[in-house]
Design a protein with these regions (language model features):
Chain A
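Interhelical loop and adjacent transmembrane-helix boundary motif
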Residues: 54-55, 208-256
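Amphipathic cytosolic juxtamembrane alpha-helices at the membrane-cytosol interface
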Residues: 82, 86, 90, 95-98, ...
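Cytoplasmic-entry segments and transmembrane alpha-helices of multi-pass inner-membrane transporters
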Residues: 12, 82-121, 148-155, 276-277
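C-terminal transmembrane helix and the adjacent membrane-cytosol boundary/short C-terminal tail
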Residues: 12-14, 154-158, 180, 192-195, ...
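Transmembrane alpha-helix signature in integral membrane proteins
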Residues: 59-89
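Generic hydrophobic transmembrane alpha-helix motif, especially the helices
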Residues: 107-143
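Transmembrane alpha-helices
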Residues: 153, 175-210
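Short membrane-interfacial helix/loop motifs at transmembrane-helix boundaries
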Residues: 25-58, 213-223
Length: 277, 248
């Protein structure tokens, strides 16, 4: 009996290790491939030059990087405040039917495919403005951020123990002031939620195809189209031109570094801390 | 302070039945009774914390200095600044320093002057006999203190806003005997300046610290009297059976 149990134990541990390795191998393989193929495209020009014409030597992805940074910044400006306020509401004020409805709608919004958001913004913004624009792209990405930030910050706030709300209220604080106290206690987790939402939308492509379009120029205005790392990767990678393909690999590497960098930074900063600090 | 015909509900379940209970000024009143008798509900009605529970209801009056605290013209936040509360499990704000913990209530009330806040912190910490132990560490987090010290910190925090009444909901049940003894002595010291109402399931504690004791059972006030009378010659049979440990 004893022997059989130990055998089953060892077999299951072995199986668990094997499945973990199976899960990690694709990730490591992608990271390695992108790094290996993309590193040769990275040089100073990559960051300072704009995208070249097909089969033309030189050039870089500077305008794409600039475009992505501008889009992400504007999207965050739209998505973070609305998402945070929504998260605060559903956690601290939403114990009624209204709050439950908001929570439900938030979950639905989180599940909408990004291309659908893109089509919606295309119809509502791109057509009336007669063209692709940074504004349209930011609205699309910002809208996608709202439910992500709302859900995760709501969870972060709910994790703050009730004893803090009680302590604050018992001292005679007003409701909004108690809420502020709770937010401050969850600031680490909320910051994490924001950073992860930013990392998520940095890698979006489909909505940008329909909203911010693509441009070989540097940024020219919020009502103009702009290049982005993700769209350029898509555009260059499926082209037959080698110089474009190389730049696409380089862009993929940069994108991966940005997204991985944000995730790793979040892990390092929150390592060892309590869940709600 | 006193309650007049106080009734309270959690949704459909009634927890307090017509409780009329006076609390003598500058005295310690203990509320005793078995679990579920309504003592915590009662004490939370005294600073309008009960109504924060979803679907909670309160009916009746709670008089403070002759005015009903449930009067419609009154702001619950103001009431809570006049009627302080200390909870069963010490709950200092984990992200604040010791000094910031003590003055938190003053900050909520809008006091900004750093010197005033520092003076208030020192005064309150001295009142709870914690000043000497922490005066070097005021900038450290409150979470680094022992359980007994944390509870005294919470009491200091409640005192800083200079309430008229202090409510204590089983303040020592999470503490060791040494810390408990310190807090009980503190309670006796505090009655010089404040009216103290303490809920306890520890009969010996009530006997040690309280001038007046109220015995509650299933949401009703059964008996109220001087602590000595309640323990040595209770009028009600139910009180006598609880005191002697026949149930509880």
């Amino acid at each position: 009996m004893n022997f059989r149990r130990r055998l089953v134990d060892r077999a299951l541990i072995g199986l668990s290790i094997a499945t973990v390795i199976t899960a990690i191998v694709p990730l490591l393989s992608i990271v390695y491939d992108v790094a290996a193929k993309g590193i040769s495209a990275i040089n100073v020009d990559f960051f300072t030059q704009a995208t070249p014409l097909a089969n033309t030597p030189g050039g870089g992805m500077g305008n794409a990087i600039q475009g992505t940074l501008i889009l992400v910044a504007l999207s965050a400006l739209i998505g973070l405040p609305i998402g945070l306020l929504s998260g605060v509401y559903t956690s601290e004020y939403g114990s009624n039917w209204y709050g439950s409805t908001i929570r439900f709608l938030g979950d639905v919004l989180a599940g909408i495919p990004s291309i659908v958001t893109g089509i919606l913004v295309y119809a509502l913004i791109v057509i009336p403005l007669h063209g692709f624009s940074v504004i349209a792209g930011s609205i699309a990405l910002g809208t996608m951020m709202i439910p992500i930030v709302s859900n995760t910050s709501s969870q972060a706030l709910k994790a703050v123990p009730n004893s803090i709300r009680e302590a604050s209220t018992a001292l005679g604080s007003r409701r909004w002031r108690t809420t502020l106290e709770v937010i401050v206690n969850a600031k680490g987790a909320i910051a994490t939620a924001c950073l992860l939402a930013i990392a998520r939308i940095t890698g979006e492509t489909a909505p940008l195809i329909l909203t911010s379009g693509i441009s070989t120029n540097w940024f020219t205005g919020v009502n103009q189209p702009v290049g982005s790392l993700t769209y350029f990767i898509y555009y260059f990678a499926k082209s037959p031109f080698v110089n474009w393909q190389n730049l696409a690999w380089g862009a993929a590497l940069i994108l991966m570094v940005i997204v991985l960098g944000i995730n790793v930074a979040v892990r390092i900063v929150t390592r060892g801390k309590r869940a709600y600090s | 302070m006193e309650t007049v015909g106080l009734n309270a509900w959690y949704g459909k379940k009634q927890a307090l039945f017509d409780v009329s209970l006076p609390f003598a000024e500058n005295r310690v009143t203990a509320i005793i009774g078995p679990s579920g008798c309504g003592k915590s509900t009662l004490i939370r009605c005294l600073n309008r914390m009960h109504e924060l529970v979803p679907e909670a209801k309160v009916q009746g009056k709670v008089m403070l200095d002759g005015t009903d605290i449930y009067g419609s013209a009154l702001d619950p936040a103001d009431i809570r600044a006049r009627v302080g509360m200390v909870f069963q499990k010490p709950n200092p704000f984990p992200n604040k320093s010791i000094r910031d913990n003590v003055v938190a209530g003053l900050r909520y009330a809008g006091v900004r002057d750093k010197r005033k806040l520092d003076e208030a912190a020192e005064r309150s910490l001295m009142q709870v006999h914690l000043w000497d132990e922490v005066k070097e560490d005021l900038k450290h987090s409150g979470a680094g203190l022992s359980g007994g010290q944390q509870q005294r910190l919470c009491i200091a925090r409640a005192l800083a806003v200079q309430p008229e009444v202090i409510l204590m909901d089983e303040p020592c049940s999470a503490l060791d005997p040494t810390a408990t003894a310190k807090i009980e002595q503190l309670v006796i010291d505090l009655k010089k300046d404040y009216t103290v109402i303490i809920v306890t399931h520890n009969l010996q504690q009530a006997a040690r610290v309280a001038d007046t004791t109220a015995f509650m059972y299933l949401g009703k006030l059964i008996e109220l009297g001087d602590t000595i009378d309640i323990f040595e010659h209770p009028r009600e049979g139910l009180t006598e059976r609880y005191i002697t440990g026949k149930f509880g």
